[in-house]
């Protein structure tokens, strides 16, 4: 029986490329991709809702409006979205449509490369960056039905020479421009969140510096068609680890779901929009005012799905904990302080994706 080509992970393991597996037209998926029931089935009485209008939508033009009433209304919407949902879409964001189109076509082009070409970017020993899969900690761990390409893009000194500089020139130049635009958009959101949270003036500079000099990473995701989509998962349910994630859907195939009050809600990306979500670190910094949310990616039997997630996180040297002005006698600290972001990153490298397990470990 023909076998899929293997890709080497940074921990020394070798696993099949799911994109290559899908080319074999299997009747059944390999056992390592069969999820435990609790990862697939909904809680008793829960359902999947396909109404994307339940997801808040933030208009960046209104958020930046010089008209005080318009700006305040949109700021209130942003605050509500972060408190009550942890997920929202942004429209009128100012990112040039031609750049977004280039991102989509170049990422599609990368995954269309031959396996031999893609493995030139495979993960090196002890590293999570590169082509492969993430969060694989054991030989018997259930695998996601996806291939990914992960790399740090900011600050510049974190870019790996064997990855970023070796990308095909059109992809590298496109990612370079996209990285800059995502950084600008993230800082608009962080600055407005500070205002909505009424962070005291003495702390605003310190909070902004955590992210203005912070890290940015990108993860390109490829979810091929799956012969048994009811048994597999594209991306295991989890909350994101860092500050803010900005997601761009590459094609028209849906798959992102978020968990709200025991219900999985299917997110339908709006045209010319990004999906944004709060991460665990931002929940810690806001002392639980803003919430990170469990989400997952599901797969289907007929169509491939692609996306790119851009993660905006603190600088590695930043000490993580609740912002002091958000701690009061009525709202005591909910999370531990004192660890640097870099230390927490190293700790998370040893974890598999598992809901909000990291955040739970940080609770007081």
UniProtKB/Swiss-Prot annotation:
Mainly expressed in stems and leaves and, to a lower extent, in capsules and roots. Pathway: Alkaloid biosynthesis; morphine biosynthesis. Disruption phenotype: Accumulation of upstream metabolites, such as thebaine, but reduced production of morphine. Lower levels of sanguinarine and 1-benzylisoquinoline laudanosine and, to some extent, of noscapine and papaverine in roots but increased accumulation of the protopine alkaloids cryptopine, protopine and allocryptopine, and of the protoberberines sinactine, N-methystylopine, N-methylcanadine and rhoeadine N-methylporphyroxine. It catalyses: thebaine + 2-oxoglutarate + O2 = neopinone + formaldehyde + succinate + CO2; oripavine + 2-oxoglutarate + O2 = neomorphinone + formaldehyde + succinate + CO2; (S)-canadine + S-adenosyl-L-methionine = (S)-cis-N-methylcanadine + S-adenosyl-L-homocysteine; thebaine + 2-oxoglutarate + O2 = 6-O-demethylthebaine + formaldehyde + succinate + CO2 + H(+). SUPFAM superfamilies: Clavaminate synthase-like. InterPro entries: DIOX_N, IPNS-like_FE2OG_OXY, IPNS-like_sf, Oxoglu/Fe-dep_dioxygenase_dom, Plant_2OG-oxidoreductases. Fe cation binds at residues 238, 240, 295. Gene3D superfamilies: B-lactam Antibiotic, Isopenicillin N Synthase, Chain (2.60.120.330). 2-oxoglutarate binds at residues 223, 305, 307. Keywords: Alkaloid metabolism, Dioxygenase, Iron, Metal-binding, Methyltransferase, Oxidoreductase, Transferase. Its EC number is 1.14.11.31, 2.1.1.-. Binds 1 Fe(2+) ion per subunit. GO terms for molecular function: (S)-tetrahydroprotoberberine N-methyltransferase activity; metal ion binding; thebaine 6-O-demethylase activity. Moderate substrate inhibition. Not inhibited in vitro by acylcyclohexanediones. One of its GO terms (biological process) is morphine biosynthetic process. Pfam families: 2OG-FeII_Oxy, DIOX_N. Residues 214-314 form the Fe2OG dioxygenase domain. Its cofactor is L-ascorbate; Fe cation. Non-heme dioxygenase involved in biosynthesis of morphinan-type benzylisoquinoline and opiate alkaloids natural products. Mediates the conversion of thebaine to neopinone. Also catalyzes, with lower efficiency, the 6-O-demethylation of oripavine to neomorphinone, which is converted spontaneously to morphinone. Supports dealkylation reactions such as O,O-demethylenation in the metabolism of protopine, benzo[c]phenanthridine, and rhoeadine alkaloids; cleaves a methylenedioxy bridge leaving two hydroxyl groups. Neopinone spontaneously rearranges to the more stable codeinone. Belongs to the iron/ascorbate-dependent oxidoreductase family. This is Thebaine 6-O-demethylase. It comes from Papaver somniferum (Opium poppy).
């Amino acid at each position: 029986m023909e076998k899929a080509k293997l890709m080497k992970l940074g921990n020394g393991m070798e696993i099949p490329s799911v994109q290559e597996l899908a080319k074999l037209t299997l009747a059944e998926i390999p056992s390592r991709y069969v999820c435990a029931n609790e990862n697939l089935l909904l809680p008793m009485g829960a359902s999947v809702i396909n109404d994307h209008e339940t997801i808040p939508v933030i208009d960046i033009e209104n958020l930046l409006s010089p008209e005080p009433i318009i700006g305040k209304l949109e700021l209130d919407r942003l605050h509500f979205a972060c408190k009550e949902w942890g997920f929202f879409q942004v429209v009128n964001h100012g990112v040039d449509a031609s750049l977004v189109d280039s991102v989509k076509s170049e990422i599609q082009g990368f995954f269309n490369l031959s396996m031999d070409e893609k493995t030139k970017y495979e993960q090196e020993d002890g590293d999570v960056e590169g082509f492969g899969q993430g969060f694989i900690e054991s030989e018997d761990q259930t695998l996601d039905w996806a291939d990914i390409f992960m790399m740090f893009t900011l600050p510049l000194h974190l870019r790996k020479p064997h990855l970023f500089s070796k990308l095909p020139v059109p992809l590298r130049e496109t990612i370079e421009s996209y990285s800059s635009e995502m950084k600008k958009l993230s800082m608009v959101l962080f600055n407005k969140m500070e205002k909505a949270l009424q962070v005291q003036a003495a702390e605003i500079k310190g909070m902004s510096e955590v992210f203005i000099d912070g890290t940015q990473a990108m993860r390109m995701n490829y979810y091929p068609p799956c012969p048994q989509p009811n048994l597999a998962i594209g991306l295991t349910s989890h909350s994101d680890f860092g500050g803010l994630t900005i997601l761009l859907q590459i094609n028209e195939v849906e798959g992102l779901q978020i968990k709200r009050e025991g219900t999985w809600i299917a997110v339908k990306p709006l045209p010319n929009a990004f999906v944004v979500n709060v991460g665990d670190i931002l929940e810690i910094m806001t002392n639980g005012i803003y919430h990170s949310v469990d989400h997952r990616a599901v797969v289907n039997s007929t169509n491939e799905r692609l996306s790119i997630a851009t993660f905006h996180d603190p600088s590695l040297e930043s000490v993580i904990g609740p912002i002091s002005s958000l701690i009061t006698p009525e709202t005591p600290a909910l999370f531990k302080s004192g660890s640097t972001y870099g230390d927490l990153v190293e700790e998370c490298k040893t974890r598999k994706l598992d809901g909000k397990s990291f955040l739970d470990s940080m609770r007081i």
